[in-house]
């Protein structure tokens, strides 16, 4: 790093800040605790490698992060003090949040009691409302991006994927898919254009659920089920949620962005307006954590006991086909699937073998079933495969030449997982795995081209969060 060294071998940046311990690292930056030499004040310094930023094409993203942080001065948003640069490094000098990540505090408890969860949620909503009033949409809200100061107050951070009003197209919508899968709104998944404010509100709803429950509302091992649950807002509240909290969540996690609750309406709700008391007066651990051991069964029982009118209202909203639209993230500099590919909490290892043993592949697309079948037929014809259209969205391809284990036989199955979104599974049903790998690399992947939204498996991004209702795992 471009740092001066004092006689005591301390690392000093530009004669002004003494660098301390590493707090965290991202793809292109590291964050350190540091001290201002003139005053001894603790700060956090985010250090970017200029060459890596330029090589990755994320220069505009870094500039946007600076612009956003200079716009947003709020007690619940991490403050940017100054920006410095040398030939090889860029330094963001920021407010230091000594309480660490909210995620870390949550991981030490099975869940938060409702008064504690409400306190954090109130602070989050006031911060998000202020950002929106300044034309800033965060687009990656999650517990890992919520820090705590010495008093335990919440601070929103990491505006690297944020958007400004100036990024809207002529239709007044954002079109870059980004964010972290489990927290991303359905309309972002559908990738047609979305209101950044409404997408942030959905993420706030997921965060509130996590604070109250200790696990994610949408967290399935099966990609098809995951997509469907998110787009239909299919989740279950555990029995310890109050009626008012459940009603608020139903409005926050409304799959239709046009009818999803607004921030002003959130603030008007009696549940939100309840006065908070200092954290010192509240237990940070739920009084009956043992209930988590049977949370799935308890949730199912509680669902049966829900108020009929409320349940009907939720079911009606779940069936809405949205008129607006990542994961995500699809790179503006990085987008939904790219971010997903970096998420260690996502795992398709059971479905996809290592590259040398590949016998299956899966991709998502926004093309119609007819277009998908037509393209697969073209691929079969070009590769001298026979082609058979089977029932229930399945097609079969069979090679004309025998390999070491006979002719290569392939089956493709098409699943509709959301409005205008299909997932296609392609698997070897006969022949040799090396022949399938050659087919995948040389014929299938190149021929599909732009028809594919994203590949899952092998050298491409995995998509599925690991484990159903478990305590949340950290997502990058």
Swiss-Prot record:
It comes from the Eukaryota. It is an enzyme of class 2 (transferase). Keywords: ATP-binding, Kinase, Manganese, Nucleotide-binding, Serine/threonine-protein kinase, Transferase. Residues 299-353 form the NAF domain. Its EC number is 2.7.11.1. It catalyses: L-seryl-[protein] + ATP = O-phospho-L-seryl-[protein] + ADP + H(+); L-threonyl-[protein] + ATP = O-phospho-L-threonyl-[protein] + ADP + H(+). Residues 17-272 form the Protein kinase domain. ATP binds at residues 23-31, 46. The activation loop within the kinase domain is the target of phosphorylation/activation by upstream protein kinases. The PPI motif mediates the interaction with the ABI (abscisic acid-insensitive) phosphatases. Belongs to the protein kinase superfamily. CAMK Ser/Thr protein kinase family. SNF1 subfamily. This is CBL-interacting protein kinase 30. It comes from Oryza sativa subsp. japonica. The lineage of its organism: Eukaryota, Viridiplantae, Streptophyta, Embryophyta, Tracheophyta. The gene is CIPK30.
């Amino acid at each position: 790093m471009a740092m001066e060294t004092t006689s005591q071998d301390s690392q000093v940046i530009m004669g002004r800040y003494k660098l301390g311990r590493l707090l965290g690292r991202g793809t292109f930056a590291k964050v350190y605790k540091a001290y201002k030499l003139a005053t001894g004040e603790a700060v956090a310094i985010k250090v970017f490698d200029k060459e890596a930023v330029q090589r990755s094409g994320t220069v505009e993203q870094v500039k946007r992060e600076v612009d956003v942080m200079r716009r947003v001065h709020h007690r619940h948003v991490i403050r940017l003090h100054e920006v410095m640069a040398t030939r090889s490094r860029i330094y963001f000098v920021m407010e230091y949040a000594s309480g660490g990540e909210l995620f870390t505090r949550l991981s030490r408890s099975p869940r938060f009691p409702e008064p504690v969860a409400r306190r954090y949620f109130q602070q989050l909503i006031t911060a998000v409302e202020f950002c929106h009033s300044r034309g800033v949409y965060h687009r990656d809200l999650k517990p890992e991006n919520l820090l705590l100061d010495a008093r335990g107050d919440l601070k929103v951070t990491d505006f690297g994927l944020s958007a400004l009003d100036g990024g809207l197209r002529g239709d007044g919508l954002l079109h870059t898919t980004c964010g972290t899968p489990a927290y991303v709104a359905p309309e972002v998944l559908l990738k047609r254009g979305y209101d950044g404010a409404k997408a942030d509100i959905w993420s706030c709803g997921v965060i509130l659920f996590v604070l109250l429950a200790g696990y994610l509302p949408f967290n399935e091992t099966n990609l098809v089920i995951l997509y469907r649950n998110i787009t239909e807002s299919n989740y279950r509240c555990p029995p310890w949620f109050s009626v008012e909290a459940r009603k608020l969540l139903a409005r926050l996690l409304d799959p239709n962005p046009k009818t999803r609750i607004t921030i002003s309406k959130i603030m008007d709700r009696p549940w939100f307006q309840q006065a908070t008391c200092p954290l010192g007066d509240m237990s940070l651990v739920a009084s009956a954590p043992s209930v988590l051991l049977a949370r799935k069964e308890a949730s199912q029982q509680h669902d049966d006991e829900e108020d009929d009118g409320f349940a009907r209202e939720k079911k009606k909203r779940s069936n809405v086909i949205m008129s607006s639209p990542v994961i995500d993230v699809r790179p503006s500099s990085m987008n939904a699937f790219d971010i997903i590919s970096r998420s260690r909490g996502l795992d398709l290892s059971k479905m996809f073998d290592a590259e040398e043993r590949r016998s299956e592949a899966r991709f998502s697309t926004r093309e119609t079933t007819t277009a998908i079948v037509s393209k697969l037929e073209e691929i079969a014809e070009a590769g001298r495969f026979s082609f058979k259209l089977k029932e229930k969205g399945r097609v079969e391809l069979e090679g004309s030449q025998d390999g070491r284990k006979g002719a290569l036989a392939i089956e493709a199955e098409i699943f509709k997982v959301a409005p205008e979104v299909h997932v296609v599974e392609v698997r070897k049903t006969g022949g040799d795995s090396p022949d399938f790998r050659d087919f995948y690399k040389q014929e299938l992947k190149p021929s599909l081209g732009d028809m594919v939204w994203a590949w899952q498996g092998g050298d491409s991004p995995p998509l599925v969060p690991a484990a159903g209702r478990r305590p949340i795992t950290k997502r990058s």
